[in-house]
């Protein structure tokens, strides 16, 4: 039986969670018991918070339309008040000073907070980190995607933010999610940084020796895709990463399709793991572009 392109896309969307979970990942950061409070404007430091407003784009109807998803999303919908997010806002942040950039992080595990070694990287680049908790690979892709959109909206409401410096990044299964979001939402995210996991709307080999070429999510509308192709997109893998070939092939496919600011970082000695602070900073700097 030969499946149509649409049927293959829908099948992939339904199995996204199990594929991501099977490929997995890293341990969460050590942080003990943390209680989340409602987000407060301009709070600095490393903390968990509850956000207040759903993004219009994270509703089931709007999200389903954007991704041409024919299934029932209602059973996967979520209550934002029951969710929490890890944030890191550098201590030098000043609401009266220069606006900060944002990295929305999609984790493969249930802790969305920043690893301690990355704090100086964010301090130096005037960036805020925000990542949903309880949004690892075991969770359906719809709430994972929706929570990232909610994160982008709320951090912009409560902080002084440069809208041209709101990015999305993720690791392993979260890297796949970040690629999908960066390409499908160039009106929300100014670029994407996918680490040891990436996905595409283009047709690539689904597995070694399969001989089958399939897209992994629907092609975005032409106006959005045109904008995505002009934004920075960074893919990071390593010599010991079991997703290395897929990352290489996917990055090459994006470049062939006209992504003009595509960067593949292939780190010698890096496995399927969180990169060092030095290598993470390299990816961020490609995302941010040269200083003004």
Where are these regions (language model features)?
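A domain-start/cap signature at the N-terminus of enzymes
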Residues: 23-100, 252, 262, 292
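Short beta-strand element of the alpha/beta-hydrolase
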Residues: 97-109
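Short amphipathic alpha-helix adjacent to the substrate-entry channel of hydrolases
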Residues: 113-130
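Primarily recognizes the serine-hydrolase "nucleophile elbow" in alpha/beta-hydrolase
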Residues: 164-226
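Catalytic active-site module of serine/aspartate enzymes centered on a nucleophile-bearing elbow/loop
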Residues: 279-292
């Amino acid at each position: 039986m030969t499946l149509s392109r649409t049927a293959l896309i829908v099948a992939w969307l339904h199995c996204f969670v199990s594929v991501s979970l099977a490929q997995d990942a890293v341990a969460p950061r050590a942080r003990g018991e943390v209680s989340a409070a409602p987000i407060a404007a301009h709070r600095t430091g490393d903390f968990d918070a509850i956000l207040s407003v759903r993004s219009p784009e994270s509703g089931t109807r709007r999200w389903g339309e954007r991704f041409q998803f024919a299934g029932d999303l209602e059973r996967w919908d979520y209550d934002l008040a029951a969710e929490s997010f890890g944030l890191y806002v550098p201590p030098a942040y000043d609401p009266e000073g220069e606006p900060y950039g944002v990295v929305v992080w999609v984790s493969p595990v249930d802790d969305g907070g920043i690893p301690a070694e990355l704090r100086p990287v964010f301090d130096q680049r005037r960036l805020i980190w925000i990542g949903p908790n309880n949004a690892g690979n075991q969770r359906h892709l719809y709430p994972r995607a929706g929570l990232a959109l909610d994160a982008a909206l709320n951090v912009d409401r409560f902080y002084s933010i440069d809208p041209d410096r709101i990015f999305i990044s993720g690791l392993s299964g979260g890297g796949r999610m970040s690629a999908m979001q960066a390409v499908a939402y160039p009106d929300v995210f100014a670029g994407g940084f996918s680490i040891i996991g990436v996905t595409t709307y283009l047709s690539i080999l689904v597995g070694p020796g399969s001989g089958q070429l399939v897209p992994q999510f629907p092609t975005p509308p032409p106006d959005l895709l045109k904008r995505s192709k002009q934004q920075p997109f960074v893919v990071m893998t390593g010599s010991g990463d079991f997703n290395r070939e897929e990352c290489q092939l996917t990055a090459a496919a994006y470049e062939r399709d006209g992504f003009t600011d595509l960067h593949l970082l292939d780190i010698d000695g890096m496995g399927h793991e969180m990169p060092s602070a030095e290598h993470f900073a390299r990816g961020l700097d490609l995302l941010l572009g040269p200083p003004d």
